[in-house]
Amino acid sequence: DENAVTYLALAAMLVKEINPDAITIAEDMSGMAGLAAPFEAGGLGFDFRMAMGIADHWIKWIKEKTDEQWSMGEIWWELTNKRSDEKTISYAECHDQALVGDKTLIFRLIDKEMYTSMNMDSKNLVVDRGIALHKMIRLVTLATAGDGYLTFMGNEFGHPEWIDFPREGNGWSYKYARRQWSLCKPDYLRYKYLMNFDSDMIHLFREENL
């Protein structure tokens, strides 16, 4: 659709004319080349594009294989498979996993044990393993991001539940239209330390310019 492509390129140019400091990010499922390439080089001129396949692959690996079966070569390929002329933003989890009908990364790793064994005193190998993998997934996704890294709300501390906005199917309920940031406050819950890991991870990469 040439008209649509022209519109997007003009919109990206207009944004920069109005506010040169603005950042434009393209979210595209088609894999169209050039979205985040300079307009002068034949691109559409967005600053970044989402690396949308990464989050889908993390869920695929977790659902279809045990972590002992994960291929390091395959993981490396998917995390670094990007066009050199476009800046990309990587992320380990997005709304596709967190909305009702699916499960968040950490819930797939720990499942029902999250409701009973996330306190610091519990000795549960499923929880310990799930938390360790959750940390490594975020760390390697950030380490290979290159241009930008995104955290979907709640993923930084392992939020246990999905998101569901009020709709006819749930009786217009607001019960799951939330993120429970209060889980990060108590010292006796592991969520606080997952959040601390995320903060330290971001700080390290920023300070060391990685």
Model-derived features: positions:
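Conserved alpha/beta catalytic core and glycan-binding cleft of carbohydrate-active enzymes
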Residues: E2-A177, K185, I202-L210
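A short, structured beta-strand-centered segment in the mid-to-C-terminal lobe
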Residues: S182-N196
